[in-house]
């Protein structure tokens, strides 16, 4: 059907909290589109016949189709189109890097800004959660049982896809709350816990059983899951083992991995005065790294009362791997970027005259060396090179290392015949099948730390393979 295309080169702006106000609270920064803004943005879509945007989506959402429904005001219909392929639309609409995926393929981006696909997805999911039909029922059981290890994006996606086909699915989560990295790793101001809980509840209504406080490799093993009657197992245990630089001073009090810092804040409320697992608040904080996790840690530290927060990154602003939107939000909130420098030592306080001085063993600063960009590395980014003799010190009280994570070796060490690569990632084929029969894996447990949507894509791929495998038994 013909319609009048909105040819504005600019997308509809996303309303946000004022930067000065939001720097002191954990409320969501982006406020979401109104119905009017969503429909107006939907009219920017050209409804391309070859649908290049879909090719950029790891879970292959029918993007032009759901946008057409938004354009016509059928928001519930749009939700049904999205959830035909995605189990976590309200999550993806908020945290997926659409600018490097579906939106990067949008034809409107050739002469202006791409259609705000992620913003429209979020609008549709939020509208459904507020006004839509929440009646979801489990399909007829098909008699097969599947165990999912981990309730992060790959595990939840795999569970949802299998549950829709009638499988009896049990998800085993090591922590006390379902959601994986979505709840322990991403702060409330970017992804509210209530949003994740709503998505998880939808899966429960589909018949998915979620058991928390079960550590596979400790509480149960993969082999014991098969002994319990499960016919296939999907490992979506993520990459929760933090990386460090191996420089002097990393054992000082006041040095955290971003993984620990965010988990304590997001999930354990360690910022409370009576917390059993407190984290340091206030003072000057240096966050080492340039990805989304670094931005999350820096902005969390600011909200916890830090006097000053620095991002320390060895490349320039152009090479920052974090989403541009997150970088802009951090800058607006007053976080200072110390670029083209890299830590070589974390400096600690030591009072030789008073070994009982309570400051002994705590961070007092960080020593960095200036960098310059050399030749491109294997990923095409210019390699940072140290400038000899350029060391300088920064006075800080807390250092947060946000330089990536690796898969935990626990499952590998308790599962005979499970092959992993040099970085600890589980080795899989194109269907997510591991070196063990009927054991599949996906997400960060395979790739190391990556995006939510790529993990979801891996969960979807594995679910399809598991269905084909069990259908043939």
Residue ranges with predicted function:
Residues 22-40, 61-94, 111-140, 265-266:
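Ferredoxin-type iron-sulfur electron-transfer modules in oxidoreductases and energy-metabolism complexes
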Residues 47-72, 91-124, 170, 177, ...:
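Iron-sulfur cluster-binding cysteine motifs and their immediate structural context
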Residues 77, 140, 145-149, 197-247, ...:
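Feature captures the FAD/FMN-dependent oxidoreductase FAD-binding
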Residues 124-140, 198-218, 242-304, 420-435:
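Glycine-rich dinucleotide-binding loop and its adjacent helix/turn
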Residues 144-170, 294-302:
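N-terminal Rossmann-like FAD-binding beta1-loop-alpha1 element of flavoenzymes
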Residues 171, 175-211, 298-345:
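Rossmann-like dinucleotide-binding cores of NAD(P)H-dependent redox enzymes
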Residues 251-282, 376-449:
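FAD-site-proximal beta/loop scaffold in flavoenzymes
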Residues 297, 445-473:
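A conserved FAD-binding loop/helix module that cradles the flavin
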């Amino acid at each position: 059907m013909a319609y009048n295309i909105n040819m504005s080169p600019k997308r509809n702006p996303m309303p946000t909290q004022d930067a000065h106000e939001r720097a002191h609270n954990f409320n969501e920064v982006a406020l979401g589109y109104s119905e009017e803004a969503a429909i107006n943005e939907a009219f920017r879509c050209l409804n391309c016949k070859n649908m290049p945007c879909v090719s950029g989506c790891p879970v292959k959402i029918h993007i032009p189709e759901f946008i057409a429904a938004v354009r016509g005001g059928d928001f519930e219909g749009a939700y049904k189109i999205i959830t035909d392929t995605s189990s976590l639309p309200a999550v993806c609409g908020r945290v997926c890097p659409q600018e490097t995926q579906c939106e990067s393929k949008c034809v409107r981006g050739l002469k202006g800004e791409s259609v705000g696909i992620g913003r429209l997805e979020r609008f549709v999911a939020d509208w459904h959660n507020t006004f839509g039909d929440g009646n979801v029922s489990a399909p007829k059981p098909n008699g097969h049982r599947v165990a999912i290890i981990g309730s992060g994006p790959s595990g939840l996606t795999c569970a949802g896809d299998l549950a829709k086909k009638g499988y009896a699915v049990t998800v085993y989560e090591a922590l006390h709350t379902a959601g994986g990295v979505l709840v322990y790793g991403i702060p409330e101001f970017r992804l509210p816990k209530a949003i994740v809980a709503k998505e998880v509840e939808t899966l429960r209504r589909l018949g998915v059983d979620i058991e928390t406080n079960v550590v596979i490799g400790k509480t149960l093993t993969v082999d014991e899951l098969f002994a319990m009657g499960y016919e296939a197992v999907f490992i979506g245990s993520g990459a929760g083992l933090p990386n460090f630089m191996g420089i002097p001073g990393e054992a000082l009090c006041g040095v955290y991995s971003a993984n620990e810092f965010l988990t304590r804040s997001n999930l354990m409320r360690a910022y409370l005065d009576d917390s059993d697992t407190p984290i340091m608040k206030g003072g000057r904080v240096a966050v080492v790294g340039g990805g989304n996790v670094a931005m999350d840690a820096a902005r969390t530290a600011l909200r916890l009362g830090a006097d000053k927060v620095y991002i320390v990154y060895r490349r320039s602003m152009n090479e920052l791997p974090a989403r541009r939107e997150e970088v802009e939000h951090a800058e607006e909130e007053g976080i200072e970027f110390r670029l083209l420098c890299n830590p070589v030592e974390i400096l600690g306080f030591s009072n030789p005259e008073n070994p009982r001085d309570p400051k002994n063993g705590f961070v007092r600063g960080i020593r960095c060396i200036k960098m310059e960009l050399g030749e491109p590395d294997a990923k095409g980014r210019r390699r940072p090179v140290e400038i000899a003799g350029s060391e300088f010190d920064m006075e800080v009280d807390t250092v947060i290392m946000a330089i990536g994570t690796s898969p935990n070796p626990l499952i590998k060490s308790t599962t005979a015949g499970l092959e992993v690569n040099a970085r600890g990632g589980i080795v899989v084929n194109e269907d997510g099948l591991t070196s063990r029969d009927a054991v599949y894996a996906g997400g960060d447990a395979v790739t190391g730390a990556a995006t939510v949507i790529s993990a979801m894509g891996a969960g979807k791929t594995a679910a399809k393979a598991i269905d084909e495998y069990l259908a043939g038994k």
